[in-house]
Regions:
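Structural motif
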Residues: 33-35, 61, 157-161, 185
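Short hydrophobic/charged patches on amphipathic alpha-helices used for structural packing
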Residues: 51, 92, 144-148
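Hydrophobic alpha-helical segments and helix pairs
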Residues: 68-105, 109-110
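N-terminal nucleotide/polyanion-binding subdomain common to many enzyme families
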Residues: 1-86
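Short, compositionally biased "basic patch" segments
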Residues: 56-67, 108-121
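A transmembrane-helix-recognition feature enriched in membrane-embedded lipid enzymes
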Residues: 66-71, 200-248
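Internal alpha/beta domain cores that form substrate/cofactor-binding pockets in large enzymes
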Residues: 103, 107, 111-119, 126-153, ...
Length: 248
């Protein structure tokens, strides 16, 4: 499968349909899906350990207009933006039709449970076999208890929504204990949307790649991240300069 690299982080050049099919057809070890956006890539640019972490994914989806813009500027156009929540929603639809079992992990107190209730209303035949919050100790007995609960529920699909880089690090550190799961996807704030605590951007804004603006307007604390996003966009070299130098 074709891929590009931005600041040392691989990005799969896939459509959402291709990403979903690849994830659900995984055999052997789990398909681990990460969704790098501009903020994540900027932090990976400054911290090679984060770049290494992101590269542990078996599927790396270009989540965000900034990533698509950067790839275009560098002469490596991506076929489309694959938003994490869109990828997750499509997985849920396929899971309902195929009888796959889904586990929801993340969010604050009650968020995963509310998301499960809402998703069951939208997908009556969907089997959400378990749900629990993400604010637990990531080591020791509490972590072991959460993993035991997940394993006991026997999910085919695990959505981990605890924010970057906590969710990615937790998945990689515990992957050997989750080897029976077919798809493990890190989806950030998707549970908050499915729970009804956060509205998704209107379709026209999503189509124009302006979901980032919508999230900032709904959550003003996100404005503090603007300098990092601006830094990412500033450091992207134009195509000519990129061609003359070694790949990022």
């Amino acid at each position: 499968m074709e891929e590009i690299k931005l600041y040392g982080v691989k990005i799969d050049n896939v459509t959402r349909e291709e990403a979903v099919c690849r994830a659900l057809r995984a055999t052997g070890e789990p398909c681990v899906a990460f969704t790098p956006n501009a903020l994540m890539l900027e932090r990976a640019r400054k911290d090679t350990a984060l770049a290494t972490l992101l590269n542990r994914a078996s599927l790396s989806l270009p989540d965000g207009a900034g990533v698509v813009w950067a790839a275009e500027k560098m002469g490596m156009p991506l076929r489309e933006r694959v938003a994490g929540i869109g990828f997750g929603s499509e997985i849920l639809e396929r899971a309902e039709r195929s009888g796959l079992r889904v586990f929801l992990l993340g969010g604050g107190d009650g968020v995963a449970e509310h998301a499960r209730e809402n998703l069951r209303k939208k997908h009556p035949r969907l089997c959400i076999c378990g749900a629990t919050w993400g604010y637990f100790q990531k080591t020791g007995e509490e972590n072991a208890s959460v993993i035991s609960y997940i394993r006991a529920c026997r999910p085919d699909v695990l959505f981990v929504c605890m924010g970057f880089p906590v969710q990615e690090r937790w998945v990689i550190e515990n992957l050997h204990l989750l080897s029976d799961i077919r798809v493990i996807a890190c989806l950030g704030g998707s549970l908050d949307v499915w729970a009804g605590d956060l509205r998704r951007a209107p379709h026209w804004m999503s189509r124009m790649g302006m979901e980032w603006l919508w999230r900032m307007l709904r959550q003003p604390k996100r404005f503090a991240k603007l300098p990092e996003i601006a830094s990412f966009l500033w450091h992207v070299p134009p195509k000519a300069e990129f061609t003359e130098k070694s790949p990022l």
